Amino acid sequence: MTVKVRKGDTVLVIAGKDKGAKGKVIAAYPRQDKVLVEGVNRVKKHTRISTTQRGAKTGGIVTQEAPIHVSNVMVLDSDGKPTRVGYRIDDNGQKVRIARSTGKDLSS
């Protein structure tokens, strides 16, 4: 499955516990078909407490984002509406992403 969502896109979560949430894509993992969305799918991770060189202790319970499957998000177009993503070849022969609903370019 090709991942049409890229880093920097604004997406809407359409399924799961964070349904309806909007956020910016921090990272995309095409081999796993997952994306990391800012402020979505926050989990608590328990990390071992360790001492740094200066004597400060780091660790404990850390809250961070976890990847979400790409099928659970939709890209938002320039109007802020969810849309499917398509491709078109422009005049220069470059492949550009377009919003299927409006036909506008999705320049990110």
Swiss-Prot record:
Keywords from the named record: Ribonucleoprotein, Ribosomal protein, RNA-binding, rRNA-binding
A GO cellular component entry from the record: ribosome
Keyword rRNA-binding: yes
Pfam short name (any one): KOW
Presence of the UniProt keyword Protein transport in the record: no
GO molecular function: rRNA binding; structural constituent of ribosome
InterPro entries: KOW, Rib_uL2_dom2, Ribosomal_uL24, Ribosomal_uL24_CS, Ribosomal_uL24_KOW, Translation_prot_SH3-like_sf
Gene Ontology BP, a term: translation
Subunit (UniProt): Part of the 50S ribosomal subunit.
Family label: Belongs to the universal ribosomal protein uL24 family.
HAMAP family in the cross-refs: Ribosomal_uL24_B
The protein's role, per its UniProt record: One of two assembly initiator proteins, it binds directly to the 5'-end of the 23S rRNA, where it nucleates assembly of the 50S subunit. One of the proteins that surrounds the polypeptide exit tunnel on the outside of the subunit.
PANTHER family per UniProt: MITOCHONDRIAL RIBOSOMAL PROTEIN L24 (PTHR12903)
Name of this protein: Large ribosomal subunit protein uL24
Gene source species: Salinispora tropica (strain ATCC BAA-916 / DSM 44818 / JCM 13857 / NBRC 105044 / CNB-440)
Gene name of the encoded protein: rplX
